[in-house]
Amino acid sequence: MYRARAARAGPEPGSPGRFGILSTGQLRDLLQDEPKLDRIVRLSRKFQGLQLEREACLASNYALAKENLALRPRLEMGRAALAIKYQELREVAENCADKLQRLEESMHRWSPHCALGWLQAELEEAEQEAEEQMEQLLLGEQSLEAFLPAFQRGRALAHLRRTQAEKLQELLRRRERSAQPAPTSAADPPKSFPAAAVLPTGAARGPPAVPRSLPPLDSRPVPPLKGSPGCPLGPAPLLSPRPSQPEPPHR
C-alpha cells in the first residue's frame, strides 16, 4: 500500500527523476522561471541538509564566541601578569650580571698572586719604616721611649707579613706542581735488572769465595748414607758447624 502511494505521489521535488519526465520545452520554461527553480532547489533534501549543517555551525560558533568573550578578562589579566614577570626577570638578570662582574673583579683583585704582591709591598713598607725609625733614633730625632714601642710593632708586622708571604708562595708552588701533567711512560728511564735475573744461576753466583783460614777437619768418621740400590739417596744429614779454632803457630 505504501509503495503504491509513493508511486502515485511521484518523485521528490528537485530529484533527477522528476526532471527526467519533463519534455524539452518544459525544461526550457523551467530554466526561464527562476522563482520556481529556486523553490525547487530549496525543497530538495540535500539543500535542506546543508541548511541544517549551516545553522548548527552558526550556533556552535556563536557559543564559542560567547565563551571566548567570557574568558577575555582572564586573558588580559594573564598578559599583564606575564609582562610584570618579564620585567622582574629582566631586573633579576641585570642584577645577576652586575654581581657576576663584581665577583670577577673581586676574584682578580684578591687572587693569590695579587695577595702575594700586596704582602710583599706591605713587607717592604714595614722594613722601610723600621729603617727610618732607626735613622731617627741614631740622629737623635726620636727618644728611646717612643722608639721601642713603634719599632716593636713595625718588626712584628714585618715578621707577620714575611711569614704570610712565604706560606702563600709555598701554597702557590704546590698548586703549580699539582697542575703539571704527569710524565709519560716513554720518558721513564729503562729499569736496570740485577745480574741474577738475567744470567744463569752458575754465572750469576760466580765461584765461591775461599776463606783465608780453614777450620780443622772433624776426626769423627762420617756414617755412610743409607739407600737401596736403584733408588736415589735421601737427603744427607747436615752437620752443625763447629767453632773455628786458631791455627797453631808455625815452628
Curated annotation (Swiss-Prot):
One family name in Pfam for this protein: Mod_r
Extract the PROSITE patterns matched here: VPS37_C (PS51314)
Asked if the Swiss-Prot or TrEMBL record annotates the protein with the keyword Membrane, the reply is yes
Start and end residues of each stretch annotated as Disordered = 174-251
Q: Does the keyword Membrane apply?
A: yes
- Can you give the residue ranges of the VPS37 C-terminal domain? 93-182
What disease is associated with this protein? VPS37D is located in the Williams-Beuren syndrome (WBS) critical region. WBS results from a hemizygous deletion of several genes on chromosome 7q11.23, thought to arise as a consequence of unequal crossing over between highly homologous low-copy repeat sequences flanking the deleted region.
Per the similarity annotation, which family is this?
Belongs to the VPS37 family.
**What is the name of this protein?**
Vacuolar protein sorting-associated protein 37D
Which organism was this protein described from? Homo sapiens
